[in-house]
């Protein structure tokens, strides 16, 4: 089929980073080795490994990791024969010190992530990553919450800092296909670097959104095997690969092996099956950061309020990633209102 780029499509598997939210950041080294080895043997291009909130995310606010993420990254690098290991870094959570550590133990790609209106805070990290010899992408989170014009403006900043690609990152799983098309098309017409798309499946359109992004020229896409990612997960990698194969894309990833990875390697790790439940559905509907789900559910239980009310209120306040402390504040306020009624 016709698409607006001649570059090959490359996939980053995010189940060992985005999926860390689902696992409450309790991945073991053995699990990371097992999953990485299977993905590598299937031909996966990139495998992202780090705390769910990126390098340096193991804190009381974001959730403590069971195993130091550098050990997990090192283990993943050790298992790879052809895939490259990627990491996520959110300025303000991760630092250039942690980025240097990750590079020294073999991480080859870093995605530097900021809120969609705050690309300026990524300059130092992008430039430093280039100095380290890493492949560097910008990652504009909560892309649904800004105008197309603002998105283009911020993407151009990341390009000027040295990013080799910029992702439209649908952190809330709130974008619909026509909105993805509009954003990717605008970036393709404005940038001279690659464009990526990272979706979440909270409204059950992650695969459709990813296909739309590819049609408009995105060449870097994300997936999570068995939807092992925050909220309702991301575009389900093995499903996405099957769709792409039907459409004529040859990505040199073994579809049968990826089905086996999903069924035999990743599925047994899931605390519960990844499906669109009311919490993740509300996040997509309200436009709330997908990693907020478990935090909101815990706060709801603590304050005896409905998690959906918490998420809707967070959406109204346009709370962004990094403001997890607001979840408890909102829950407490809702509980107080409930008592007064």
UniProtKB/Swiss-Prot annotation:
The record marks 17 as: Transition state stabilizer. Belongs to the 4-hydroxy-2-oxovalerate aldolase family. The keyword Manganese applies. It is an enzyme of class 4 (lyase). Keywords: Aromatic hydrocarbons catabolism, Lyase, Manganese, Metal-binding. GO terms for molecular function: 2-isopropylmalate synthase activity; 4-hydroxy-2-oxovalerate aldolase activity; manganese ion binding. Residues 9-259 form the Pyruvate carboxyltransferase domain. The active site is at residue 21. GO terms for biological process: catabolic process; L-leucine biosynthetic process. This is 4-hydroxy-2-oxovalerate aldolase. Substrate binds at residues 17-18, 171, 198, 289. It comes from the Bacteria. Mn(2+) binds at residues 18, 198, 200. InterPro entries: 2-IPM_HCS-like, 4OH_2_O-val_aldolase, Aldolase_TIM, DmpG_comm, DRE_TIM_HOA, PYR_CT. It catalyses: (S)-4-hydroxy-2-oxopentanoate = acetaldehyde + pyruvate. Its EC number is 4.1.3.39.
């Amino acid at each position: 089929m016709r698409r607006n780029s001649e570059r090959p499509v490359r996939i980053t598997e995010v189940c060992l980073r985005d999926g860390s939210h689902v696992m409450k950041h309790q991945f073991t080294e053995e699990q990371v080795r097992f999953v990485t080895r299977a993905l590598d043997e299937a031909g996966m291009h990139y495998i992202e490994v780090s705390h769910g909130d990126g390098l340096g995310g193991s804190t009381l606010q974001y959730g403590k990791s069971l195993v130091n993420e550098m050990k997990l990254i090192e283990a993943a690098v050790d298992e790879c024969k052809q895939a490259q290991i990627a990491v996520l870094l959110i300025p303000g959570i991760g630092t250039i010190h942690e980025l240097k550590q990750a590079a020294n133990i073999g991480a080859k790609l870093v995605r530097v992530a900021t809120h969609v209106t705050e690309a300026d805070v990524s300059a130092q990290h992008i430039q430093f990553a280039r100095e380290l010899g890493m492949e560097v992408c910008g990652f504009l989170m909560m892309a649904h919450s800004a105008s197309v014009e603002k998105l283009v403006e911020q993407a151009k900043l990341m390009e000027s800092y040295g990013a080799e690609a910029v992702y439209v990152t649908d952190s809330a799983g709130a974008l619909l296909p026509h909105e993805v098309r509009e954003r990717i098309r605008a970036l393709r017409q404005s940038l001279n670097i690659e464009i990526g798309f990272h979706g979440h499946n909270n409204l059950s359109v992650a695969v459709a959104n990813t296909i739309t992004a590819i049609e408009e020229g995105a060449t870097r896409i994300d997936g999570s095997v068995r939807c092992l990612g925050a909220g309702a997960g991301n575009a389900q990698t093995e499903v996405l690969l099957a769709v792409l194969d039907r459409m004529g894309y040859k990505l040199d990833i073994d579809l049968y092996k990826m089905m086996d990875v999903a069924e035999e390697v990743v599925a047994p790790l899931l605390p519960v099956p990844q499906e669109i439940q009311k919490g993740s559905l509300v996040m997509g509907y309200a436009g709330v950061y997908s990693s907020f789900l478990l935090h909101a559910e815990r706060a709801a239980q603590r304050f005896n309020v409905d998690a959906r009310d918490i998420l809707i209120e967070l959406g109204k306040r346009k709370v962004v990633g990094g403001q997890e402390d607001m979840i408890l504040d909102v829950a407490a306020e809702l509980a107080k209102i409930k008592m007064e009624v």
